[in-house]
Amino acid sequence: MGLRREARELALQMLYAQDTLQGSLRDTLRGFREGVETGERTREFAEALVQGVMEHREAIDQAIVARSKNWALSRMPRVDLNIMRMAAYELMFKRDIPKKVSINEAIEIAKKYGDKESPAFVNGILDELEACPKDEERSDTE
């Protein structure tokens, strides 16, 4: 498994823990630093991804909801939602990562961690987000 895939999977675990436990982000990151053995570059990429998602969570969640026909965030499976948050962060705020790579990585992670409907659900919403004509959703700020 590649460094970035491993980092995205670690980031998913961090986001899920943050979403479920609702403690401070600092405590969540510290818990993973102390409790999960991984390479430094993997951990750094995962933490940067988590911090980016948390920093832009409101905009990311709004973008997901806008493309989720008849789905409120509260009804979405937590794993699927956090996979989409990671990919949406990359699609909206990271110009150095090709959009198709972000979507494909999210689908593969959904296959591994979600249920049998997860890959199609994640793909459908991310395809809508990727196809959005509003270029201002993809920021150069990071």
Curated annotation (Swiss-Prot):
Gene Ontology BP term (one): DNA-templated transcription termination
Source domain of life: Bacteria
Gene3D superfamilies listed in its UniProt record: NusB-like
CC per GO annotation: cytosol
CDD domains reported for this sequence: Terminator_NusB
Family named by the database record: Belongs to the NusB family.
Full protein name: Transcription antitermination protein NusB
Lineage: Bacteria, Pseudomonadati, Thermodesulfobacteriota, Desulfuromonadia, Geobacterales
Underlying gene: nusB
